[in-house]
Amino acid sequence: MSESHSLGKNGERLAIKYLRQNGYKVLEKNWITGRKEIDIIAEDDEFIIFIEVKTRMADFQLHPRDTVSVHKQRNIIFAAQTYIQRNEIEKEARFDIITVVVEGAKHELEHIKDAFYPTL
């Protein structure tokens, strides 16, 4: 496993731990439809939440949230629509980003709710 892949998987583990500690129910990890993937699908009482996790080292020049391109957002939205249809979900959808910035043995996690909208 490459170092960046390992870093990303660690970020996803931290994100899932955070979500569970904050009352979210994690439904899926790395859910794939065709060539599109959603890192985490979770829910709370009100929303079905599609979450992109971005993990970077502290010395990376861009903040992780700035690396989620419009193209990536469209792919997540398309995959989310497929998931909602296949599973007959009736809750309102929300699209979040969780960023994890790693510096040595420490990390900083940020949960950005409503990070983007399906009107793209």
Predicted region positions:
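Secondary-structure boundary/capping motif
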Residues: Y24-K25, K29-N30, I49, E110-A115
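Short, glycine/acidic-enriched loop or turn micro-motifs at the edges of active sites
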Residues: W31-T33, T55, T99
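Mg2+/Mn2+-dependent nuclease catalytic core
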Residues: M57-I77, T82
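Conserved catalytic cores of phosphodiester-cleaving nucleases, focusing on short active-site segments
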Residues: L19, I38-F60, I76
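Domain-level recognition of nuclease-like catalytic cores that cleave nucleotide substrates
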Residues: R86-L120
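Acidic-basic catalytic patches of nuclease active cores, encompassing PD-(D/E)XK
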Residues: M1-K29
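Short acidic/glycine-enriched loop/turn segments that link adjacent beta-strands
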Residues: T33-K36, A105
